[in-house]
């Protein structure tokens, strides 16, 4: 059994070698010749999986180690009788922590408290729900918009997008990309929406590039609209609008979900799905794969305020470490993908063991996802 895996899927070689012969290949582009005798294909979001790639090939199963699936023609796979699995929620924690790292940086730079801001969350799936929970644990007001879930009658106080635009100080997008249909998200943030944002608002896109109209956004910024912008995703990736990059406050190369834990979850989820597909079901404990974190433990004295939280968050991950490299190479062919391929190891907050002498600080840090314990001061 021959299994092709994206060369940038961590732990893929070791895991899938339990099931067959593994060949690691670049994800963009996949060499069609390598598909000629392969039984399974494991990809990331950079690989377009459709009829033109797989027609006439012996592939029986496709797995994507990503939460999003807009790069996969699922309807064609089903029609062709090819098994498929994604990894929903695998990088949700990573994206939430990216948003926090960005907001805490902007709050420190611009001198505001997040408690004084209302956060509008567009898309309340695996990422949006986790973001809502962590924000509300801190006492930060959230407004939720998710028309598909609202129409299904899912639990939640869902508002219209217009209401979020009117009342939110921070608007963050966490939707799939739907190019048409009743829940179209292509250019959901169009010129009209962008111009309608509150003065001084923060706009964040860490889902799919085309959810925000990049041309319209650049026009508004060039005209002097007072707006802070965080973009991890871009229309036309791996190409991006270099002028837009110079105008945004934080720009990164589609790495919001790139924690080691998130990548490992994606790989293990599709590994388990494929092992079940071929009748040799196996399960993998994530902690058996991950290395020891760089920081073993730290001690925190006193209550948890915003500056202290910012220091803890940035000790694990400071978004600026990914902003600067992109600005240096923007516009150079191949460099966007190179930044992603050679991405420095990044961990999640749970990797940081925090010993607190304040019980409320320990409790709150645990709610936020840190590995925190209370030890009273002696």
From Swiss-Prot:
User: Which family does the record assign?
Assistant: Belongs to the D-isomer specific 2-hydroxyacid dehydrogenase family. PdxB subfamily.
EC numbers listed for it are 1.1.1.290
Catalyzes what?
A: 4-phospho-D-erythronate + NAD(+) = (R)-3-hydroxy-2-oxo-4-phosphooxybutanoate + NADH + H(+)
Identify the domain of life: Bacteria
Tell where it localizes: Cytoplasm
Query: Keyword NAD, does the record have it?
Result: yes
Q: Which organism is it from?
A: Shigella boydii serotype 4 (strain Sb227)
Which pairs are disulfide-linked? Answer: none
Cite the binding residues for NAD(+): 146, 175, 232, 257
- Subunit structure as annotated in this protein's UniProt entry: Homodimer.
**Any GO CC annotation of this UniProt entry:** cytosol
Q: Which HAMAP family match?
A: PdxB
Cite the PROSITE patterns for this sequence: D_2_HYDROXYACID_DH_1, D_2_HYDROXYACID_DH_3
The name under which this protein is listed is Erythronate-4-phosphate dehydrogenase
What pathway does the UniProt record associate with this protein?
A: Cofactor biosynthesis; pyridoxine 5'-phosphate biosynthesis; pyridoxine 5'-phosphate from D-erythrose 4-phosphate: step 2/5
Q: What is its main location?
A: cytoplasm
Q: Which InterPro entries match?
A: D-isomer_2_OHA_DH_cat_dom (IPR006139), D-isomer_DH_CS (IPR029753), D-isomer_DH_CS1 (IPR029752), D-isomer_DH_NAD-bd (IPR006140), Erythronate-4-P_DHase (IPR020921), Erythronate-4-P_DHase_dimer (IPR024531), NAD(P)-bd_dom_sf (IPR036291), PdxB_dimer_sf (IPR038251)
């Amino acid at each position: 059994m021959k299994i092709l895996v994206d060369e940038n899927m961590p732990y893929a070689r070791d895991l899938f070698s339990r099931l067959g012969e593994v060949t690691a290949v670049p994800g963009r582009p996949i060499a069609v010749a390598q598909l000629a005798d392969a039984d399974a294909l494991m990809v990331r979001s950079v690989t377009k999986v459709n009829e033109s790639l797989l027609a006439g090939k012996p592939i029986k199963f496709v797995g994507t180690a990503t939460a999003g699936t807009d790069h996969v023609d699922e309807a064609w796979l089903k029609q062709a009788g090819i098994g498929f699995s994604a990894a929903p929620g695998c990088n949700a924690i990573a994206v939430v922590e990216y948003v926090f790292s960005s907001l805490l940086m902007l709050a420190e730079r611009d001198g505001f408290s997040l408690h004084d801001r209302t956060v509008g969350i567009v898309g309340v799936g695996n990422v949006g729900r986790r973001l809502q929970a962590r924000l509300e644990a801190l006492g930060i007001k959230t407004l939720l918009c998710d028309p598909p879930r609202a129409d299904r009658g899912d639990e939640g106080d869902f508002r219209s997008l217009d209401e979020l635009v009117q009342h939110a100080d921070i608007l963050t997008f966490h939707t799939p990309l739907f190019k048409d249909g009743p829940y179209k998200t292509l250019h959901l943030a169009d010129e009209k929406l962008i111009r309608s944002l509150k003065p001084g608002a923060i706009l964040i896109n860490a889902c799919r590039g085309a959810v925000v109209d990049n041309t319209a956004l650049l026009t508004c910024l060039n005209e002097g609209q007072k707006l802070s912008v965080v973009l991890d995703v871009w229309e036309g990736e791996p190409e991006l609008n270099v002028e837009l990059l110079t105008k945004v406050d934080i720009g990164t190369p589609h790495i919001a979900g790139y924690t080691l834990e998130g990548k490992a979850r994606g790989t293990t989820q599709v590994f388990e799905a494929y092992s079940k597909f071929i009748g040799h079901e196996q399960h993998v404990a994530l902690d058996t794969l991950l290395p020891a974190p760089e920081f073993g433990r730290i001690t925190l004295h006193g209550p948890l305020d915003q500056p202290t939280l910012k220091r803890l968050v940035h000790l694990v991950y400071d978004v600026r470490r990914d902003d600067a490299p992109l600005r240096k190479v923007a516009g150079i062919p191949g460099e966007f993908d190179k930044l992603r391929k050679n991405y420095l190891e990044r961990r999640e907050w749970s990797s940081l063991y925090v010993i607190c002498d304040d019980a409320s600080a320990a409790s709150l840090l645990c709610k936020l996802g840190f590995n925190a314990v209370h030890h009273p001061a002696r």
